[in-house]
């Protein structure tokens, strides 16, 4: 298929979360390659870089599910966004499915399942990137927030529906199940046009039983990583263990803080979230820098001897792990996380059983028992897959050729 136009669908018109960053950065890169790119989004603000790069923006100007003050209207719209459906049909009508491809990154927060019905109705080939598990699991993570543990239920089975796993309450879990039923119906009806790509081998394996029900083709499409600096970090004189990410229970931030405190290690946390104030009060020994970018971020990264990625749920990948490895910083990662495929134990990092705090503590001790110069030498010879934006675009264009 000779692709001329690409319509990118994403909940937000700016960078919000990992999926949003990929949607935004890839849209800019595709436009720079000469494609006519349309960015279809619902929730603002819209980043001015889009139009500055010649990207056409379709903006619905709607609040997302969490910030909308009218919770009932928001809940209904989150199941079926009528405006998104209507405007998507209008947008698609301006292009031909013979030379135009749809790329979907985020739809759960605002756009809803309605957009998939428009792709089927207008017969557009759709590349759906599986940044999370929402195409199968009602809460998007195969994670029981009540038990703070990985969930083993088959998604949308009777056992799943009857299990209170939601971070809020069981009524909200039932609402999620209704939303999931609508999404499943829309996806299955659009199966002829959907090509679904997971962001890691683990993600692809977990979603395979579900993806076969709604996608005509599937595979793995690795996300590109941000090249913050081309220089490698010299860890030989560094002392800090680093955490990068949201400060939420499921990300394992408490495990990070606890282990560096108990072992009397230096800790740096880059990220924000609802736990920030409590963590600052509870762990005054740890540096909490919030979200930082550019030279400020590089300054903190240069202090790191190791990244701890203590997530308690099955992350589809873990971009921060790939980014730190690319800069020469070893990582400690739990088994069952997508980024674990990048780790060669005792070479560029260590692994432990997900959710096992004692296992994490053993791994951190083991890391410290090895001379830092030895870790540095091992990191200097590591071979990582090429996760540059150029490689990502090449893989996307290869997919275009198979449509």
Model regions and ranges:
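N-terminal strand-loop element at the rim of the active site
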Residues: 33-82, 91, 273
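Membrane-proximal helix-turn-helix segments that form the acceptor-binding/catalytic region
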Residues: 121, 134, 146-196
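Carbohydrate-associated surface elements
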Residues: 202, 224
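Conserved donor-binding/catalytic core segment of Leloir-type glycosyltransferases
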Residues: 225, 234-251, 257-262
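Nucleotide-activated donor-binding/catalytic signature segment of Leloir-type glycosyltransferases, i.e.
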Residues: 277-299
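Short hydrophobic beta-strand element within catalytic cores of glycosyltransferases
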Residues: 330-333
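Short acidic/histidine- and often glycine-rich active-site loop of Leloir-type glycosyltransferases
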Residues: 336-346, 350-351
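A charged, aromatic-enriched C-terminal amphipathic alpha-helix characteristic of glycosyltransferases
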Residues: 371-401
């Amino acid at each position: 298929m000779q692709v001329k136009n690409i319509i990118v669908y994403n909940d937000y018109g700016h960078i919000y979360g990992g999926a949003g960053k990929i949607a935004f950065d890839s849209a800019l890169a595709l436009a720079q390659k000469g494609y006519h790119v349309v960015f279809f989004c619902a929730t603002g603000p819209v980043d001015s870089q889009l139009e500055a790069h010649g990207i056409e923006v379709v903006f619905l100007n709607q609040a997302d599910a969490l910030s909308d003050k009218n919770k009932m209207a928001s809940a209904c719209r989150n199941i079926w966004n009528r405006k998104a459906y209507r405007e998507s049909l209008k947008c698609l009508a301006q292009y031909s499915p013979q030379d135009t491809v749809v790329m979907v990154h985020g739809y759960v927060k605002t756009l809803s399942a309605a957009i998939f019905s428009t792709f089927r109705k207008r017969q557009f080939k759709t590349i759906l990137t599986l940044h999370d598990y929402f195409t199968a699991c009602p809460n998007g993570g195969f994670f029981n927030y009540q038990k703070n543990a990985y969930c083993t239920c088959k998604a949308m089975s009777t056992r799943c529906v009857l299990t209170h796993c939601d971070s809020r309450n069981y009524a909200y879990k039932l609402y999620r199940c209704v939303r999931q039923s609508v999404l499943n119906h829309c996806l299955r009806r659009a199966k002829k046009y959907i090509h679904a790509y997971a962001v890691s081998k683990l993600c692809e394996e977990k979603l395979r039983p579900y993806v076969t029900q709604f996608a005509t083709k599937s595979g793995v499409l690795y996300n590109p990583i941000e090249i913050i600096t081309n220089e490698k970090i010299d860890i030989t004189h560094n002392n800090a263990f680093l955490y990068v990410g949201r400060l939420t229970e499921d990300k394992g931030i408490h495990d990070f803080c606890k282990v560096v405190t108990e072992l009397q290690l230096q800790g740096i946390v880059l990220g924000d979230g609802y736990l920030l104030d409590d963590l600052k009060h509870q762990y005054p020994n740890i540096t909490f820098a919030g979200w930082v970018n550019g030279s400020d971020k590089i300054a903190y990264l240069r202090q790191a001897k190791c990244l701890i990625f203590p997530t308690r749920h099955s992350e589809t990948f873990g971009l921060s792990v790939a980014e730190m490895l690319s800069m020469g910083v070893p990582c400690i990662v739990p088994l069952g996380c997508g980024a674990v495929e990048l780790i060669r134990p005792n070479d560029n990092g260590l692994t432990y059983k997900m959710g096992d705090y004692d296992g994490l503590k053993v791994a951190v001790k083991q890391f410290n028992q090895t001379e830092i110069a030895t870790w540095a030498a091992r990191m200097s010879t590591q071979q990582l897959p090429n996760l540059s934006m150029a490689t990502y675009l090449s893989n996307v264009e290869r997919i275009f050729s198979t449509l």
